[in-house]
Swiss-Prot record:
GO MF term list: structural constituent of ribosome
Signal sequence, start to end: none
Species of the source: Burkholderia lata (strain ATCC 17760 / DSM 23089 / LMG 22485 / NCIMB 9086 / R18194 / 383)
Lineage top rank: taxon: Bacteria
One cellular component (GO) term of this entry: cytosolic large ribosomal subunit
Keyword GTP-binding on entry: no
GO biological process: translation
TM region(s), chain numbering: none
PANTHER family from the UniProt entry: LARGE RIBOSOMAL SUBUNIT PROTEIN BL19M (PTHR15680:SF9), RIBOSOMAL PROTEIN L19 (PTHR15680)
Name listed for the protein in its UniProt record: Large ribosomal subunit protein bL19
Pfam families named in the record: Ribosomal_L19
Sequence similarity: Belongs to the bacterial ribosomal protein bL19 family.
Record key words, sorted: Ribonucleoprotein, Ribosomal protein
Known function: This protein is located at the 30S-50S ribosomal subunit interface and may play a role in the structure and function of the aminoacyl-tRNA binding site.
Length: 130
């Protein structure tokens, strides 16, 4: 492992200190809790939407979350290892066949729905036993 890769790995470990980032994929509905600083106050703001893209680049990894707010589509890019991220919660698993869901930008209403990935009972029982 070269020097830059070692430094990046150390920074990732430092950024994850005490935090866990769940496994999520494009199509999943997530709630991203973001630390927002307003003046001298600090609060947590929740941003819920569908993950339309994930970019895995080590320390520079990010993901794009899209939601519909007041009839307008809003996309926000989050750095995966940012200290501003308080937590990420996966609310619903989506069943999609693409890595990038940019086609959802042109769609609205029923055509923008994503099928839910149902987990079999065998897998949930095995996961709970481990």
């Amino acid at each position: 492992m070269n020097l830059i890769a070692k430094l990046e790995q150390e920074e990732i470990e430092r950024a994850l200190a005490g935090k866990t980032i769940p496994e999520f994929a494009p199509g999943d509905t997530v709630i991203v809790n973001v630390n927002v600083v307003e003046g001298n106050r600090k609060r947590v703001q929740a941003y819920e939407g569908v993950v339309i893209a994930i970019r895995s680049r080590g320390l520079n990894s990010n993901f794009i979350v899209r939601k519909i707010s007041s009839g307008e589509g809003v996309e926000r890019t989050f750095q995966t290892y940012s200290p501003l991220l308080a937590s990420i919660v996966v609310k619903r698993r989506g069943d999609v066949r693409r890595a990038k869901l940019y086609y959802l930008r042109e769609r609205s209403g029923k055509s923008a729905r994503i099928k839910e990935k149902l987990v079999s009972k065998d897998r949930t029982a095995a996961a709970s036993q481990e």
